[in-house]
Amino acid sequence: MAGDVYPHFRAAAVQAAPVFLDREATISRLADWVTKARDVGAELVVFGESFIPAFPLWNMLYAPVDQHAFYRRLFENAIEIPGPQVEQLGGIARRHGVVLSVGVTEKGSVSMGAMWNTNLIFGTDGRLLNRHRKLVPTWAEKLTWSNGDASHLRVEHTAVGRLGALICGENTNTLARFALLAQGEQVHIATYPPAWPTRRPGANIAYNLTDAIRIRSAAHAFEGKVFNIVSSCALDERTIDEVSQGNSDVQSILNSAPPSASMILGPQGEPLAEPKVGGEGIVVADVDIALSIEQKQFHDIVGYYNRFDIFRLILDQRPQSAMTVLGNAVEATEEVRERDRSSLKESIMTVTAQDREDPAKWPRKMAS
């Protein structure tokens, strides 16, 4: 058939539990899950929020004065980018020939304490394509993670189409979602934690993570006419034991919290496979990018179905850092030396003939 051919592939949303705050063991577990996903034909494999080394559930469950040990363990097992763990993850993607997306806690190379909630995307060749830091840590997460920037809030061209990603609550942020759609996003990745406890057991107004994931995921797929690959982490007994440390109150809160969910949705917001609610497993579905074309006829909010003469979104993708260096240090030093030489020359030229005989009248630089 004549004309363009668009990507058609199989996606896998992995819902798995990490080995709590054990970076190396969790990467090994990730490799096993990628093998399972590849065995069923997956070409895009997605893992949940801060899968490596774990999601900081303790932020919601303990007072800040009781969180220091958790914070240190998280930092010690976080990932520095670039670094050996990034090379490992790239190697896993390359060996299996998949596009790999994984949530990590990233630590800074300068500060012994700065961490970010980050999503990494690797190409089939193992190259790191994108490192997106969550723009704003949500609620209690502010006790752990720093703000990200928009330097990597972008869509990547991959073997499975134009790929964008947002982390957890960012999928509530209309402007962040539109920024990806406006860059031509075809496949969206949304990642979530294993649980989100906001109330003690029995509260009938507690935040329902399962419903929140379902509503946001369908909304973005429908509004943007994109496919949405949604992956959450799973909550296992080891994590509950490690976080609760024998505290029955904390155990009760975690056991009663609404579970996470993983799913794959089409451009009408429809599930393409049975969602996975709670527990571990893989959601697998076939994605045909061309199916978005018909839906775009009805509502194309980054095309004809908008008024850009009325609405305007500005995206600042400049990286943010602790310090901005203007110029090269060596060049700056030479500039100072040249300025001093010029100043000295001018001082010498101001010495009159009669002053030459009286050193007390010499300019200081000449006298020295």
For every predicted segment, state its role.
Residues M1-L44:
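N-terminal active-site segment of His-dependent metallophosphoesterases
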Residues H8-F20, T118, R131-R133, G161-E170, ...:
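Active-site-proximal beta-strand elements of phosphoester/diester hydrolases
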Residues A12, L120-F122, M263, V283:
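Conserved hydrophobic/aromatic positions in well-ordered beta-strands
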Residues R23, T35-T124, P194-A219, E223-V226:
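Cys-nucleophile CN-hydrolase/nitrilase-fold catalytic domain and related Cys-dependent amidase chemistry
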Residues I79-S101, R162, C168-V283, A367:
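CN hydrolase (nitrilase-like) catalytic-core segments centered on the catalytic cysteine
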Residues D125, N130-H132, P275:
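Short hydrophobic alpha-helix segments
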Residues T138-R154, G169-L175:
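Active-site glycine-rich loop that binds ribose-phosphate moieties when present
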Residues F227-N228, S232-S368:
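C-terminal beta-strand edge segments of enzyme domains
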